[in-house]
Amino acid sequence: QFKQAREYFDFTDMIEEYILRGEDIPLDALFIDEAQDLNFLQLRMKEKLQENSVQTYIAGDDDQAIYSWSGVDPKHFIKMQGDVINLKQSYRCAKSIHKIAMKIRDRIKLKRDKTWEPRPEEGKIVKHADLYFARETAKGNWIMMGRTKNICKRLTSFCREKGFYYATRYGNSVSEKRLTALQTWLDIQQGELISLAALNKLYFYIAPKDRIARGKKEQLKRYIKENPSAKKEMVSVEKIQSDWGLLVNTEMSWFDLFTNYPHEDKLYLDSLLRRGENIFGKPRIRIETIHGMKGGEEDNVLLLMDMGKLAYDSYKQGEDDEHRVWYVAVTRARNELHLVDPNSDWGYSI
C-alpha cells in the first residue's frame, strides 16, 4: 500500500513483474555469477531465464554464502544439478592462510565436496592480544575488518589515534573538500595560480576575522554562483590579496589559518602529514564489515575477532552461517593475516 500510494516500483517489483508477465527471452547462453547469493525470488527468475537458454553457466561458492539473513538459502546452490568444474587453484591465498581457512571450513556441516590449493608462498598468520599491538599496520596496504558496523568503530578510532589514512564505505577519512582546501593553501604558499573554485573551498575553512577582508568571502561565493564559468578563472596570490581580500601572510601554517576546521580533525590531519601518509592518493587502509568486504582482497588483512551477541549465539548453536562469514573474512588475505583477540566475551575462536 505504501508503494502503491506513492507509485514506487523497486528492484524487487521488477523481478516479480518479469516472473509473472515478462516475455520469454531465447538465449544461446545464460551466465550467472555469485549464484550462492541468490534469494528465493532471484532463483525463480533464474529458472525462468534458464528454460529458454541453450546453455547455462553458473559460478559460485557455497562456502561464501553469507546472506541468509536476506532470504538466501545455501541449500539451493549446494543441490544444483549439472556438470561441475571445480577451480582447484587459488591465486590469492598463501599456504598459512589456506590452512586457517580450511580449519574454519571443516566446521561447516552442509557444503559441496571440493578442494582448492593455495599459492606456493608460505604467508604469515599473526595473533595480537590487543589492536594496539599491531605495529605492522604502520606501513603497507591493509584491509581491516570487524563483524559489525559497531565493532568497526574501534578500527576507525585506532587509525585516527595512530595518524593512519583510511577509507570506509562512507568515504575517505579526510574529505575531498578539505584536501582541496589544504592543497590550495600549499599551492598559494608556492606562488602558484589558483582557480576561484579552489579559493572558494579554501575560504570555507577560514573565519573572516583578521584573515579575509570584510565581505570578500560572501562576495566570492556570489560571484561564482552568478557566473558559473568563473569557477575556472585562475588568479595569482597578488590578485587573491587585492581582489578577494586575503589578509594573512602566505607563510602562515594551514593549521593556524583553518579557523573554521574542527580542532580534533585538524589534529588528525596534522598527524597524517607528520607521519608522511599520502593523503592526496588512495588511502592505504580500508575499513569495512566482513559482509561489506566480500569480494575484496589485500596483501595484508587485520581482523577483529569480536562478534555481536546475536552472531555469537548463532555461532555457539553450531549454525553454519557464522562459520561461512569467518571463512570469507580470512580468505580476503593474500600474504599476511593478523587476528586480534576479542575484548569481550563474544568472540570467534580459531
Which residues are covered by each model-predicted region?
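Accessory N-terminal region flanking or inserted into the helicase ATPase core
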Residues: 1-31, 40-45, 58, 68
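Flexible, surface-exposed loop/gating regions in the mature catalytic domains
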Residues: 1-6, 10, 18-21, 84-89, ...
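A residue-level signal for conserved active-site and pocket-lining positions in enzyme catalytic cores
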Residues: 14, 97, 329
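Flexible, charged surface loops at secondary-structure boundaries
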Residues: 23-27, 134-140, 331-332
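Conserved helicase motor core of SF1/SF2 NTP-dependent helicases
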Residues: 29, 36-122, 139, 143-158, ...
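Helicase-core coupling region on the C-terminal RecA-like lobe
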Residues: 102-136, 145-162, 167-226
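Conserved helicase C-terminal RecA-like lobe
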Residues: 188-340, 344
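Long, charged, helix-prone linker segments
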Residues: 346-350
